[in-house]
Amino acid sequence: MNQVRKADPNNKTVAENRKARFSYEVLDTIEAGLVLTGTEVKSLRQGQANIQDSYASVEGGEIWLINSYLPEYLQANRFNHEPRRRRKLLLNKREMAKLSQSVDREGMTLVPLKIYFNDQGRAKLLLAVGRGKKLHDKRETEKQRDWSREKGRLLKERG
């Protein structure tokens, strides 16, 4: 019969950058692993991470997540981690080459969209390759969103 499905504790969004899709035109997304310490994983599982002001950069053939905030794990005492340290991202060589090429040549930006745990319980970062929107682009997006809402209301009233 109908079984009630429990939410999988592993497959859970921990932090989301909701302003990224408003401020950037997202052209491509890619999933990257994160190199974390034990206390960082425990802190992530508590769900208090923040990636609003963070970005990724290519340095020396490696990609780093910069300015992300993972609060200290309270039970860790002196073995705690630095909350705003740079974290290395795990990608294939081909993926790294593609991202570094798009950042260097085309002037794109690497923007983190969300941090989540996958089915195996590993922390992953959804990374977007995007171009910054100008003010008029943001206004145009907002107009389109308002019009689609209004259109939905009109269709709902008639139908």
From Swiss-Prot:
PROSITE patterns assigned to the protein according to its UniProt record, in alphabetical order: SSRP
Q: Which Pfam families match?
A: SmpB (PF01668)
Q: Which organism is it from?
A: Mesorhizobium japonicum (strain LMG 29417 / CECT 9101 / MAFF 303099)
Keywords attached to this Swiss-Prot or TrEMBL record, sorted alphabetically, are: Cytoplasm, RNA-binding
Tagged with keyword Heme: no
- What GO terms in the biological process aspect are recorded for it? trans-translation
Output this protein's name.
Answer: SsrA-binding protein
**What does this protein's UniProt record list under function?**
Required for rescue of stalled ribosomes mediated by trans-translation. Binds to transfer-messenger RNA (tmRNA), required for stable association of tmRNA with ribosomes. tmRNA and SmpB together mimic tRNA shape, replacing the anticodon stem-loop with SmpB. tmRNA is encoded by the ssrA gene; the 2 termini fold to resemble tRNA(Ala) and it encodes a 'tag peptide', a short internal open reading frame. During trans-translation Ala-aminoacylated tmRNA acts like a tRNA, entering the A-site of stalled ribosomes, displacing the stalled mRNA.
Q: Superkingdom of the source?
A: Bacteria
Q: Which GO terms describe its cellular component?
A: cytosol
* PANTHER family found in the cross-reference section: SSRA-BINDING PROTEIN (PTHR30308:SF2), TMRNA-BINDING COMPONENT OF TRANS-TRANSLATION TAGGING COMPLEX (PTHR30308)
Localization in the cell: Cytoplasm
Which segments does the entry list as coiled coil?
Answer: none
Question: What residue spans carry the region label Disordered?
Answer: 137-159
Q: Which GO terms describe its molecular function?
A: RNA binding
Could you say which protein family the record assigns here?
A: Belongs to the SmpB family.
Keyword field contains Transcription regulation: no
